[in-house]
Amino acid sequence: MRRVIPLLCSLLLLCSCGAGPSASAPEDSSRLVIFTARSAAVYDDAVREFERRTGIWVEVRTADGTLPLLEQIAAGSSGGDLLLGAAPDSLSAYGDCFAPYTAPLAADIPDAYRDSEDRWTPFSLLPTVLIYNDQLVQRNVPDSWADLVSVAWRGRIACPDPTVSATGCTALQALLQVLPGEEEAVLTAFSRNLSGVLPSAAAVADAVADGSCYVGVTTEDLALQAADSGLSITVVYPAEGAVVQPDCAAIVRDCAHEDNARAFIDFLLSSEVQTRLARQLRRPIRGDADAALPPVLSYDPYGAGAHQAELLAIWRSLTAEDAA
């Protein structure tokens, strides 16, 4: 039976379960602990079907952002076996934390999206996009990364907190790549335009849809799902190019259930799961993954990962000054 536990509460809840597993729980060898910041819509059906087919008992531990999960894994003794849903720019900053694994179907993944050491396995493509509320914004609509620092949007932009959300961190990296000027000046201009930082990319879509913010930065799947459900959202692929990275799964080094984690990665790459991802308005990784992609920003995720700690230090300093 699958369990979903918010990560910050997981230790308390697990300690309250008693001295041993419940009667319905399997032996330890038939367990798998997944860490994820993705919405249940991404993983729920896949986890249920994986459990049904394999008999492996999956526990899903969730958090609002990918970066706290990575930090917990890096600290050691996290208890997690698999990180589900993270991009190479964030993963590469924690590369030593993950065990290489070459899945049998990895050859179907375009080389451009694979890690040279197979420390993480892509299972879908996930562009970072802009959105705006089309009831509130009907002229001079934002269509570029550069628009995010325009004074026209002062206090009206929603962005996931870059210190928590990998999507927010990617947005900062994209702005620095596209815009001229000193890093601190670019980041200052962007921070002044924010209505406030939000805990996740999903929260950005909600804030733009309800009109609390006019413009936002989020992931393509969340943006398309919001628009498809009839909310007042228009999706924009930035004129300079969208940042397109693979969404990946990575096995925690020295985890307790490595074989089960490998089996789950194999399942993610199966035709059935890849087809299901397409139905969820996500881009499957196998086959012609580049088909119908929007204009893509040339983006080096490994360089971004190497710069991540320095970037976040600057951002924390700026936002602390704004709050003072």
For the regions a language model picked out, list residue spans one by one.
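Early extracytoplasmic/lumenal segment of secretory-pathway proteins
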Residues: 18-93
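Periplasmic-binding protein-like
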Residues: 107-112, 126, 187-191, 197-198, ...
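Mature extracytoplasmic/periplasmic domains
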Residues: 252-303
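Ligand-binding "clamshell"
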Residues: 94-102, 114-118, 225-237
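C-terminal motif of bacterial Sec signal peptides marking the signal peptidase cleavage site
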Residues: 13-16
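Ligand-binding pocket segment of bilobal, Venus flytrap-like solute-binding proteins
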Residues: 173-240
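Periplasmic solute-binding protein
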Residues: 88-96, 116-142, 170-174, 178, ...
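A structural signal for short loop-to-beta-strand junctions that line the ligand-binding cleft
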Residues: 78-83, 99-130, 146, 156-162
